[in-house]
């Protein structure tokens, strides 16, 4: 009989057996039977990521970045790769080999003879992250540096007419635009295009290459800048800041600039330009200091349309607390569209619809599209004839590619994959790129020749294979399931069975609760906080899409409004009972875990039942009254909890607070939070830990450095995952010794012997 190992022991043993070439009886019996090994948390840290896919102007080649993690050093290293779009993944070539440095943001020259990119390969040690601009040929050879910007290059873009590359550089809040002629890159000296006193915050080319539009603050507070330079780094909440305006820079001639928005009525954001360069769409944010520069600033903005020739401004929306999407122009530049709530006047969680109008129909009402679809309708990209809009949308436990016929107002899913599928199109070349992930396939990029062929998997061509090591993992079977909740509501979710699952045998259960709550668990690879690692260790994992989740229609998403916690709790517990009734889960061995909203419901479970043997809660609330002021978002809390301010209805907030019921807590609970979390600040977790400590309930509080809602450091992500699983093993299965730092330190030592991920293309070189 084999004794299951602790989470760290599993990780270390797998690493050592691979490094030595020995794969004996140290793996679990289930993994031996499948001829593979279970997935570990170290494997999760080693997953490589594809980014910045960029087709060549002739549509024959694809440049992309491949990011390789080094979790022991808490960093990632990025190189550039090239693949033939017609030949597919077998033709992949690595173009850069910078080891400790990075190459990012590849962009093709318009004639396809070379490409440009950013890199810190020659950056000094005291400015290691500072990028410069480089040029390289796709057929190989050494890259050539084009810039020597003192402060580095922030970003760059090439004009569509192929004449110029423009980049942004300078000190923070003082960045300016510079240009180099493509025809003379060998000897060219950068020419300053702007000398704006407040710098350039964001910018983009007009498609006709005659103008550059940039956004910049109206003024600079020199005293505020001086105090920061003098290290008076006090953080002032909602400081007075200048609004930002839109400017036009003429590329040819004397390079004059012209201000297009003024008066302080709004602050410019999310600028888009029509393909004929005659129209500009933008979001105007509120000038109110308390409604701008905050996480939810978009809901206080409105959309505007500007005539690029005359400068005439048309306000398109006039509503409070509605966050429309940016404007998207049709390819023929005759119409525009944006997405927003079904009720375009009232804040809420109603399904998004698409609103369309001809540009010439100034002042006329929008045409609402997609009303009959019980899900969100959005604007991804238009068909070439401007008749159809394509977008990606969650449908039950999947993500699919969907079309909206603008003229006939019909919505139709184009794919029916038991997977996570999304599509994007390169606007210059029309190349279609599909991202695909399922229970056994990590995120992989494909292409298809025409949108009409998207529904036929056989017509897809694979372009990337960033994580071939996944094929060696013993993975649990993943499937979508449904069950009936306490009130008869049909609820869905994802079930991950243990590796080597045998019908009729009961397994320890982990309930992995997603955040949001306006989100959903889908049939992608290794979702649910590492569900495949738990499956490899002998657990069955339930990832419930409880009420409040997306993908299952408007009613399920909004059923928690005014009664936030109870319906979702009922759904989760009914799912647990369903698995027990099916003979899959052992009701005597159950644990629950979650982050953010998943932490909220973990805390509610803690204070409403003792059926679970262990809980691990991350960034969860305890007291909605105090969280309202502590958090960086307020309006959605108010909406969910009855649509009143807490000061007008304390009971509505308190009745939904786990702290009110804390004396019911009996379950050993591990707590995780980032110290500077802005969304669910750490005092919520500290409050829970103190209460459990005083009530005599076993508890551990892990506080991670950082100022983000998620754990930023890969090393600490690893610690969180391993300590969490050790907590489950100890209390749910009665195994192991909880968490030991010595094991983590040993893992760091053993990682040096662990072979790096090698793709087939790497091996060929």
Task: State each model region's role.
Residues 57-58, 110-111, 160-161, 207-208, ...:
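Residue-level detector of Asp-centered blade-edge/turn motifs that repeat once per structural unit
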Residues 85-88, 137-141, 181-186, 250-254, ...:
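Short loop/turn segments that connect beta-strands within beta-propeller blades
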Residues 530, 535-536, 543-765:
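Active-site-proximal cap/loop segments of hydrolase catalytic domains
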Residues 54, 212-216, 222-224, 238-246, ...:
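Non-catalytic accessory segments flanking enzyme active sites
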Residues 502-507, 512-552:
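Short substrate-entry loop that stabilizes the transition state in hydrolases
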Residues 59-62, 112-116, 162-165, 212, ...:
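Hydrophobic beta-strand positions that form the internal "hydrophobic ladder"
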Residues 33-74:
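Mature N-terminal segment immediately following signal peptide/propeptide cleavage
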Residues 66-79, 96-104, 118-134, 142-154, ...:
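A flexible loop/linker signature enriched in serine peptidases of the S9 family
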